[in-house]
């Protein structure tokens, strides 16, 4: 029976491992959606207010250029992931790339997308520092604990 697989990813090596896992371990009959949630910085980059902190105002152009570069890296990673799945036998028409701006939060947005008829969420374990993970938690941890009525597979 074919499944709908949601691969939550960014441009990290850990995320790409989840794509490799699906390519090796799941039937090519399945439908795969490569899903990414981007932080929506457009409003911040277009902000023209005298109340902006002078330090931020002076760095705004550099910040927005970095955000544009991040968007390019994510797009390239998603295309590379699709190519890997197609080379593993998945039909190109059964591998979709879906990039959305953050709505409620990255983990909550992944869980909201998962409610659209997916059978499993696959994602990489995020390699963040122990201290940062202690205070903020990782996206994969939040998805794992927040998932209801759907399996979550975390690639290491």
Identify the role of each PLM range.
Residues 2-64, 88:
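Small/aliphatic-rich secondary-structure junction motif
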Residues 15-18, 106-107, 136:
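Amphipathic coiled-coil/heptad-repeat helices and related helical stalk/stem segments
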Residues 26-28, 90, 115, 147-148:
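Short conserved AdoMet
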Residues 35-37, 98-102, 155:
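Conserved beta-strand termini and adjacent loop/short-helix elements that scaffold enzyme active sites
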Residues 68-73, 77:
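Low-complexity, serine/threonine/proline-enriched polar segments
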Residues 79, 83-120:
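Structural beta-alpha unit
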Residues 112-156:
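Gly/Ser-rich helix-loop-strand patches that form or flank binding pockets
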